[in-house]
A protein has these predicted regions:
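Short hydrophobic helices that act as membrane-entry/anchoring signals
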Residues: 5, 16, 203, 207-218, ...
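Serine/threonine-rich intrinsically disordered cytosolic regulatory regions enriched
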Residues: 448-490
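Membrane-embedded multi-pass helical conduit in multi-pass membrane proteins
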Residues: 11-34, 58-60, 328-421
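Non-transmembrane catalytic domains and loops of membrane-associated enzymes and transporters
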Residues: 58-321, 492
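Hydrophobic alpha-helical transmembrane segments and immediately flanking/interface helices
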Residues: 97-106, 424-444
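Alpha-helical membrane-protein architecture signal
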Residues: 293, 297, 322-326, 395, ...
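Cytosolic juxtamembrane regulatory segments of multi-pass membrane proteins
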Residues: 64-77, 399-413, 432-454
Length: 492
């Protein structure tokens, strides 16, 4: 129904535009048509379905050698252990787990942080489960170098990149491998679920922003097999794609500065140049979102700057006839129209005469669009979130639209003019951990009756991107004891 409704609406806009070119009708018809077309992803996102496999395809996937890489830097030790435990507990056993400590150090005392207890437990547990586990410590050079320290020469078939404070659902790896039944698929994005969705008003707002993106914009891109950015929280890659760019990926530069952000979009672009990139909504990982404005502001600016810089790479390397080229162009056009259209309306006396009706039309359309997007909340059901919570999120979805317009849009413009700050990544000065109350187990259900379950017990770890200090937040904790290549990436 969303697709049919969008088609009817598009025809109406096209007719209005044709009439306007005859000298009659609304002089802004073309601008409204373009604005409408930029919402292409909303109806398309409803066409995404989790990829499934036949018995024969599953046997082939079961033969793949899977390597999980976990970079670590000044990590909260209990959170790191929870992350590794979630990898051990996968229904589809992985073959290798490669942990790389990127020179963790306590800056207050200038002494190395080596995680001796967790390292010993990890290596012993890996041996007991007959999984090849390694734990290396390197000089601090950043996440990309930590990843390629082991992946450049790893002989695996599939590489899984996982943040060290993420918690995998038990079926995450099994589900994430299924799209690789298609030999043209080069990378798979996991589905990121907000864990601390009800902590405060900000996390509720971010939940309204995250879910429509992961199950909206990214889902629409997946239908086209052109997911532009995998989440660094959880992503799967054909190993040859990553190995082919060793030495280039970790040394990317922009305006002579090393790129310390958007590593995930770089790997995704490599995959897009070699084949298809998709999203698997049933491969679920739980993550934490900021609980303070300062944390959220700095995280958003970092992402926006990195994405804007990556736009230059997309437009340079993506085929001009493909969706990978035009999607970032559409994003820039949408940003431009958000500034130009209001100015044009104010400058046109004819439009000013109908200002009240025009404003009401815009408001009604915005409400409809935001509510249509918000219906994606019902695509993921959790037993730690009552149905009433999702109903309220849908009803309040227009607030997210206002947030995008009056908060994120100005931030995006500022990020564009300060995009040269790509090397500001910071370092953690300390690790601060506190326990939170225990909860019962939580489950996540998808429309096709896929149910995922994780134990939810206290933990504390969320990194502030400016101070790099950890914040006290609840995250799950187990109850058990404890191929195309191109020039090196520089843009002057």
């Amino acid at each position: 129904m969303p697709v049919a409704g969008a088609a009817v609406w598009a025809i109406e806009h096209a007719i209005a535009t044709a009439v306007a070119f005859t000298g009659h009708g609304n002089s802004m018809a073309l601008a409204w048509l373009v604005s409408f077309l930029l919402l292409w992803w909303i109806p398309l996102s409803w066409m995404e379905r989790p990829v499934t496999t036949t018995t024969r395809q599953q046997r082939i996937l079961d033969e793949l050698v899977v390597t999980v890489q976990v970079p670590v830097y000044n990590e909260d030790e209990p959170a790191l252990r929870d992350c590794l435990q979630s990898v051990f507990d996968q229904s589809r056993t992985v073959d290798r787990i490669r942990v790389v400590d990127d020179g963790s150090i306590d800056k207050a005392t200038n002494t190395p942080i080596t995680y001796p207890a967790t390292k010993a437990w990890f290596l012993e547990e890996a041996s007991r489960r007959r999984i090849h586990g390694t734990w290396d410590r390197t000089v601090n050079r950043g996440k990309r170098h930590a990843q390629m320290h082991v992946l450049a020469d790893d002989p695996g078939d599939i590489f899984v990149t996982l943040d060290s404070d993420s918690i995998l659902d038990r079926e995450a790896v099994a589900e994430g491998l299924k799209p690789f039944r298609d030999p043209n698929v080069r990378s798979v994005a996991g589905c990121v679920i907000v864990l601390n969705s009800r902590s405060n008003l900000l996390t509720r707002m971010l939940c309204m922003l995250y879910t429509p993106f992961t199950r909206g914009f990214r889902s629409a891109q997946s239908v086209l097999k052109r997911v532009m950015v995998n989440s660094g929280t959880l992503a799967f890659y054909r190993a040859d794609v990553v190995r082919a760019h060793a030495g280039i990926y970790e040394n990317e530069q922009f305006l002579g500065r090393p790129m310390q952000m958007n590593d995930d979009s770089m790997l995704t672009m490599y995959a897009m140049l070699a084949g298809d990139t998709v999203h698997q909504p049933s491969s679920i990982v739980f993550t934490l979102v900021p609980e303070t404005w300062k944390h959220y502001r700095n995280q958003s600016m970092r992402w926006m700057r990195g994405t804007f810089v990556r736009t230059f790479w997309w437009m340079k390397y993506m085929p001009v006839t493909g969706a990978g080229f035009w999607m970032p162009v559409a994003e820039l056009l949408q940003l431009l129209l958000s500034v130009v259209i209001p100015v044009a309306l104010v400058a046109d006396p004819a439009q000013r005469a109908h200002a009240s009706s025009l404003i009401w039309s815009v408001v009604l359309v915005a409400l409809a669009m935001n509510w249509l997007i918000a219906l994606r909340f019902f695509m993921v059901a959790r037993d730690d979130e009552p149905l009433s919570f999702h109903v309220w999120l849908v009803l309040l979805a227009p607030l997210a639209g206002l947030w995008r317009m009056f908060v994120l849009r100005p931030m995006h413009l500022y990020a564009m003019v300060t995009c040269w700050k790509v090397s500001n990544w910071g370092t953690r000065d300390a690790v601060e951990v506190a326990a939170a109350p225990a909860f019962e187990d939580a489950a996540v259900s998808l429309p096709d009756d896929v149910t995922v379950r994780i134990p939810r017990i206290p933990v504390a770890k969320l990194l502030d991107p400016e101070t790099e200090k950890t914040l006290t937040l609840p995250i799950p904790r187990p109850r058990e004891p404890v191929n195309a290549q191109f020039e090196p990436e520089t843009l002057a």
